[in-house]
UniProtKB/Swiss-Prot annotation:
Region spans: Disordered: 1-50, 165-187
Organism for this UniProt entry: Chicken anemia virus (isolate Australia/CAU269-7/2000)
Enzyme Commission numbers on file: 3.1.3.16, 3.1.3.48
Keywords: Early protein, Hydrolase, Protein phosphatase
Protein name: Dual specificity protein phosphatase VP2
Source domain of life: Viruses
Compositional bias per record (Low complexity), positions renumbered to this chain: 21-32
Protein task: May act as a scaffold protein in virion assembly. May also play a role in intracellular signaling during viral replication.
UniProt family annotation: Belongs to the gyrovirus protein VP2 family.
Single GO MF annotation: protein tyrosine phosphatase activity
Induction: VP1 and VP2 are detected 12 hours post infection, while VP3 only after 24 hours.
Catalytic reactions on record: O-phospho-L-tyrosyl-[protein] + H2O = L-tyrosyl-[protein] + phosphate; O-phospho-L-seryl-[protein] + H2O = L-seryl-[protein] + phosphate; O-phospho-L-threonyl-[protein] + H2O = L-threonyl-[protein] + phosphate
């Protein structure tokens, strides 16, 4: 049965349901707009709660996303888009250069009219660093999980390599005949003496003045 009083929808055989999208898992969720149009670079776009998210961030590093997209990859792109928006807002509070992306590169890392209050800057930038680390942990976890076309990726333990590099870079001191040297190698006498009144005072004993030393 057609809408609009039983008359067929405009355009002939195309119905209103087909224009709006199928309901259910394949349709758009509440607050989401799905665009089926492909860009020249072959990535899709979604608008979720006013934030435009695409799969181009993940497609750059993993070309298989163009063939096998997963639902959580949209979540990644949405999280990245929100993070970039927060970066722009935080950058506007401490710098007037106009583009926060310039600070990502060493040759363009100069700031203009930057606030001199280090505490204020740290308070503004710290949430961005925490969110970035948290997002990276989520990405690393999902990246390590197996997929139909990829085996499980195990995390590489690097602390043993770092320890070996430190031992290789270590050079013994020549003054000690090849042994290790430090500022605390000299013998330090921690004995304050049994005749000292400090020990008696700390132990609660009555303080007694030591007898004068007789010099022969």
């Amino acid at each position: 049965m057609h809408g609009n009083g039983g008359q067929p929808a405009a355009g002939g055989s195309e119905s209103a349901l087909s224009r709006e999208g199928q309901p259910g898992p394949s349709g758009a969720a509440q607050g989401q707009v799905i665009s089926n149009e492909r860009s020249p670079r072959r990535y899709s776009t979604r608008t979720i709660n006013g934030v435009q998210a695409t799969n181009k961030f993940t497609a750059v590093g993993n070309p298989s996303l163009q063939r096998d997209p997963d639902w959580y990859r949209w979540n990644y792109s949405h999280s990245i888009a929100v993070w970039l928006r927060e970066c722009s807002r935080s950058h506007a509070k401490i710098c007037n250069c106009g583009q926060f992306r310039k600070h990502w590169f060493q040759e363009c890392a100069g700031l203009e009219d930057r606030s001199t209050q280090a505490s204020l800057e740290e308070a503004i930038l710290r949430p961005l660093r925490v969110q970035g680390k948290r997002a990276k942990r989520k990405l690393d976890y999902h990246y390590s999980q197996p997929t139909p076309n990829r085996k499980k990726v195990y995390k590489t333990v690097r602390w043993q390599d770092e320890l070996a590099d430190r031992e290789a870079d270590f050079t013994p001191s020549e003054e000690d005949g090849g042994t290790t040297s430090s500022d605390f190698d000299e013998d330090i006498n921690f004995d304050i003496g049994g005749d000292s009144g400090i020990v008696d005072e700390l132990l609660g004993r009555p303080f007694t003045t030591p007898a004068p030393v007789r010099i022969v």
